[in-house]
Amino acid sequence: MFSHQDRDRDRKEDGGGDGTEMKSKSRSQPSGLNRVKNLSRKLSAKSRKERKDRDSTDNSSKMSSPGGETSTKQQQELKAQIKIGHYILKETLGVGTFGKVKVGIHETTQYKVAVKILNRQKIKSLDVVGKIRREIQNLSLFRHPHIIRLYQVISTPSDIFMIMEHVSGGELFDYIVKHGRLKTAEARRFFQQIISGVDYCHRHMVVHRDLKPENLLLDEQNNVKIADFGLSNIMTDGDFLRTSCGSPNYAAPEVISGKLYAGPEVDVWSCGVILYALLCGTLPFDDEHVPSLFRKIKSGVFPTPDFLERPIVNLLHHMLCVDPMKRATIKDVIAHEWFQKDLPNYLFPPINESEASIVDIEAVREVTEFQRYHVAEEEVTSALLGDDPHHHLSIAYNLIVDNKRIADETAKLSIEEFYQVTPNKGPGPVHRHPERIAASVSSKITPTLDNTEASGANRNKRAKWHLGIRSQSRPEDIMFEVFRAMKQLDMEWKVLNPYHVIVRRKPDAPAADPPKMSLQLYQVDQRSYLLDFKSLADEESGSASASSSRHASMSMPQKPAGIRGTRTSSMPQAMSMEASIEKMEVHDFSDMSCDVTPPPSPGGAKLSQTMQFFEICAALIGTLAR
């Protein structure tokens, strides 16, 4: 059966260094004793359940006794209930190193939650403040059908209460102990869900580092929920980790040897051990004597039963490769033929790169609403435009966008349905939008901030203007009309992606260099999109790479205006475009919607870059509005 000795020692051993430094335990015991131990575990669990049922029956009989004692006892029980926030604490689910996990009942909805109670004094004495902080930070943003959800954190002077998703199916460890080795289809289903959750973590720069069946919970439908992110760590490009984390039986060779490792490869190794346990009911590397266990892990040699299919054996050997450079990646696992069989669509929703290039303004607003951040929309924009993909605001934004894409785990939705988002309170007023410049145009842009909390350097910069056209048509229809208008105006353009182009007027002379303008499509809310007009004059005047600059633009609320013009038979019906001009602070551009392209300046004098930018915008808007 499934023997797992690290369950009792994983809290005592944080690893690190060579295995010979650890305290040796007794030599390996015969397999018969393991079976006795597993049977004893089952019997003890059964006896505990019987005692619990008996106590419950006794309590019920007392409550049903005649007389007025029933209501009195009920009132006493209600008074004795412990309430934290909107949650009433019930029975204890388990006891850990830092505190207890109790069942909580939301007093309004009566939904069950799991309340993890962390004692502040224990946290400080054990020097695990960073561990707890990492778990809270990661779980508060993770929204995946197979990762445990953290709803709320309540702090008191003595304790920290983590209000988490309640799952009633117990640990995957107990499930394996009860059922032994699983059928291939069931093992594959569990494994697919685990890999989906791990891939989600890695894509958002988090490694778990303690994956094992005890940290994999099951809900009432036997769906996996990854829990316990206390040992997780944020990945940073170029950085390596040395900390020995996790349980010895599931730890990769480089971890127990104290070598440097990047992060994702250790999770892949742990997933390989879990897959072996699911299919075989035992562990690939197991020994009561810790130094012997470490020698087995470092050798990478494990038994492969005859009942395992050849594709499974190949996958296991690829995942449990001692050399981390040759070890399978998560992408390799997902692409494997055995893994792909009966793979549900929702686990890995396809990401359309063109759709991904459209910035979700609702997601930006949601990031600003996190009380822990206290940031303005411009700061989120700056993080998205910056060179650091691991910025905490960028990670938060991407997590929110991913949450909108991932469907419920029991539904099988089409690709289009993955992008249907239901706003909480309907579409709100249009705020200023973030600007996203492709890497080929600008490596980093430092925006001008209007809020008083901005840095001194940014406070001295002039306020930004924004210019755009808002439409409820499909993105491809909007861009079709944009390209049609640019062609009609005889402009030149360069396509960065289907929703981002650089445009300019055709030069009057070979030596002329007309100012360029960026057209970028953004998603405003569920039903509408914003076509942003942005001047690139400052970037041109700075340097070829255009690392950062101020820019001229302006914001435009819109008046409906129908679009006329021929359309090919392959395109849908004409869209309804909105365009109008907001109140200006400096100039009155009420005549910008003219139908003709403005004539060149008299005398050949050059117009200012800003005025030329406005004239190009006016020409495009006028053409689109016809």
UniProtKB/Swiss-Prot annotation:
GO cellular component: axon; cytoplasm; neuronal cell body; nucleotide-activated protein kinase complex; nucleus
Entry keyword set: ATP-binding, Kinase, Nucleotide-binding, Phosphoprotein, Serine/threonine-protein kinase, Stress response, Transferase
Residue ranges, compositional bias (Low complexity): 542-555
Active site: D210
Biased composition range(s): Polar residues: 58-77
InterPro entries registered for this protein in UniProt: AMPK_C, KA1/Ssp2_C, Kinase-like_dom_sf, PRKAA1/2_AID, Prot_kinase_dom, Protein_kinase_ATP_BS, Ser/Thr_kinase_AS
UniProt EC number: 2.7.11.1
Keyword Phosphoprotein: yes
Regulation: Activated by phosphorylation.
Keyword Calcium: no
Distribution of this protein across tissues and organs: Expressed in the pharynx, the ventral cord, neurons including the hermaphrodite-specific neuron, body wall muscles, the vulva, the excretory canal, and weakly in the intestine.
One GO term (biological process): protein localization to lipid droplet
MF terms (GO), sorted A to Z: AMP-activated protein kinase activity; ATP binding; protein serine kinase activity; protein serine/threonine kinase activity
Comp. bias intervals (Basic residues): 38-49
Classification via PROSITE patterns: PROTEIN_KINASE_ATP, PROTEIN_KINASE_DOM, PROTEIN_KINASE_ST
Deletion phenotype: Shortened life-span. Temperature-dependent hypersensitivity to stress, slow body bending, abnormal modulation of head oscillation. Reduced survival following oxidative stress induced by the superoxide paraquat. Reduced survival as a result of hyperosmotic stress induced by NaCl. Double knockout with aak-1 results in reduced glycogen accumulation.
Region (Disordered): 1-77, 541-568
Residues modified as Phosphothreonine: T243
Domain Protein kinase stretches: 87-339
Positions with biased composition (Basic and acidic residues): 1-24
Family under the similarity heading: Belongs to the protein kinase superfamily. CAMK Ser/Thr protein kinase family. SNF1 subfamily.
Function: Acts as a sensor that couples lifespan to information about energy levels and insulin-like signals. Role in motility and response to oxidative stress. Involved in the establishment of germline stem cell (GSC) quiescence during dauer development. Plays a role in axon regrowth after axotomy in PLM neurons. Plays a role in the maintenance of glycogen stores which are necessary for resistance to hyperosmotic stress. Plays a role in the regulation of flp-7 secretion from ASI neurons.
PANTHER family with a match to the protein in the record: MAP/MICROTUBULE AFFINITY-REGULATING KINASE (PTHR24346), NON-SPECIFIC SERINE_THREONINE PROTEIN KINASE (PTHR24346:SF110)
Subunit structure: Tetramer, composed of 2 regulatory (R) and 2 catalytic (C) subunits. In the presence of cAMP it dissociates into 2 active monomeric C subunits and an R dimer that binds four cAMP molecules.
Name of the protein in question: 5'-AMP-activated protein kinase catalytic subunit alpha-2
Lineage: Eukaryota, Metazoa, Ecdysozoa, Nematoda, Chromadorea
Gene that encodes it: aak-2
